[in-house]
Amino acid sequence: KDGTVKSYDVVRKEYLKSLNRNIDKKEFGFFVNERQRPFIPDSIKTRSYQNEAREKWQENSFKGIYDMATGTGKTITAITSLIDLLEYKSYYIAIIICVPYQHLVTQWGEDLKKFNIQYIAGYSDNKRNWKHDLEKQIFDLNHDIRDYICLITTNASYRTTFIQNRINGI
């Protein structure tokens, strides 16, 4: 009442404002703040069946599998669904996208960039120090410094002890 006791949300917001985000930008090449939240670009137009699938997914507590034919926009449906989830629950979300081949990691990454979703490309041949990045982002997520993390990985890398142990630490 006298201003000395602050709610968790107020303290968290003040703390996040005080961070030198340029450090993260220098280390990771990006940082996340409110102005850089993921969004659906105006250039993306979803079809009625995609919107219906997203609504059904939301009604099912954001759980389910999209079973759609080739070329019907599964990736866009999935990414716009992620945006819906991030808007509904704006913190502590771990997004893991598993694909069968490394070139699909790259394709998903290119699509996620259009929606301003920051991600880690995690697979064995990636030259970037993605394992360190993943550990850092999980630490930040667990300590309320980061609202979400997104890992795109291959099925083979997903099955590794390294990734499984990190997922269990979230």
Protein language model annotation of sequence segments:
Residues 31-170:
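SF2 helicase/translocase NTPase motor core
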Residues 1-31:
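Signature of lipid phosphatidyltransferase scaffolds
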